[in-house]
A protein has these predicted regions:
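Short, structured beta-strand segments at or near domain termini in extracellular proteins/domains
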Residues: 166-177
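Functional-site microenvironments in short loops/helix caps that host divalent-cation chemistry
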Residues: 1-156, 162
């Protein structure tokens, strides 16, 4: 209820659930919103990675699985060292051209949408989709300090989680007025 805006979530049965219809208050971004901002906003062509160019990441492109944590994780980015063993302070690495920080690296992000697999949807265009109305797992987008494989570092990578993880965080969004 920040700034007098209505709550976007309420507790029901020990879980936080979205208010319907979604009000104008602060909320988690939908997977579609996150993907648009991460891959397209301010660009003519979609970005593959949160840094400019191809794999591997350029020096200090973000907080990914690297030499600092190679003794703990199975996959790290070869030859990369961002100087952090875990999460880094927000804004430690350069912002994307549109001004957003840490859309790849540092912590993966919890989305508003519940997780679902959509077979046969690759050739269908959907405008501003949202996931199922209910579920057990939420979509997680973005890489984290534990991400070291080429697929995990792509902005198209999606994961899911039922609860907290040490490399999982969130950002807030709200509808433009």
């Amino acid at each position: 209820q920040k700034e007098g805006r209505p709550e976007a979530y309420r507790e029901a049965g020990g879980r936080m659930v979205a208010v319907s219809p979604m009000p104008t208050g602060y909320r988690l971004p939908t997977e579609a919103e996150w993907s648009y901002v991460a891959r397209m906003l301010g660009r003519q062509d979609p970005s593959r990675y949160p840094w400019t160019g191809s794999y591997p990441p350029t020096s200090l492109a973000g907080n990914f699985a690297d030499a600092q944590i190679a003794d703990t994780l199975a996959h790290v980015v070869p030859g990369y060292d961002d100087k952090y063993r875990g999460s880094a302070p927000v804004g430690r690495f350069a912002a994307q051209p549109d001004g957003f920080y840490d859309l790849g690296g540092n912590v993966a992000e919890w989305m508003h949408d519940y997780y679902a697999v959509y077979p046969g949807m690759a050739d269908r265009l959907v405008s501003d989709p949202s996931g199922p109305d209910s579920g057990d797992h939420h979509v997680v987008r973005g890489s984290s300090w534990r991400s070291g494989s080429i697929s995990e570092l792509r902005l198209s990578y999606r994961d899911y989680s039922r609860g907290p993880r040490p490399d999982l965080g969130f950002r807030i969004a709200r509808y433009a007025e």
